[in-house]
UniProtKB/Swiss-Prot annotation:
It is a peripheral membrane protein. The keyword Cell membrane applies. Keywords: Auxin signaling pathway, Cell membrane, Developmental protein, Growth regulation, Membrane. The lineage of its organism: Eukaryota, Viridiplantae, Streptophyta, Embryophyta, Tracheophyta. The keyword Membrane applies. It comes from the Eukaryota. GO terms for cellular component: plasma membrane. This is Auxin-responsive protein SAUR68. May promote auxin-stimulated organ elongation, such as hypocotyls, stamen filaments and petals. InterPro entries: SAUR_fam. It comes from Arabidopsis thaliana. Belongs to the ARG7 family. It is found in: Cell membrane.
Length: 102
């Protein structure tokens, strides 16, 4: 029979490993139509849609009123992310329509 201390240590180790796997999985995005690499070009920022499609834009787009409003909506819906990508609360089709109609 295992002692309590050893059992607690083992459980903590498993929790840490599980947390690391969750973090790794949450950052993998395979459905990218705008850019296929995970690296971003210098001077660009990336957002993801609710259906996990990746969009990369030049930083100069941050001054665009439509982009600013979309980021405010994302902040209200999900909060400001401290880790991970910025996610917009709608699908890629609606996002594409929003930015193309401007």
């Amino acid at each position: 029979m295992m002692n309590t201390k050893k059992l607690m240590k083992m459980a903590k180790k498993w929790q840490q490993r599980a947390a690391l796997r969750r973090k790794r999985i949450s950052f993998q995005r395979s459905n990218s139509t705008t850019s296929s690499s995970s690296a971003v070009e210098k001077g660009c920022f990336v957002v993801y849609t609710a259906d996990q499609v990746r969009f990369a834009f030049p930083i100069s787009y941050l001054s665009n009123s439509v982009i600013q409003e979309l980021l405010k909506i994302s902040e209200e819906e999900f909060g400001i992310p401290t880790e991970g990508p910025i996610t917009l609360p709608f699908d890629s089709i609606r996002f594409s329509w929003s930015i193309s109609s401007n």
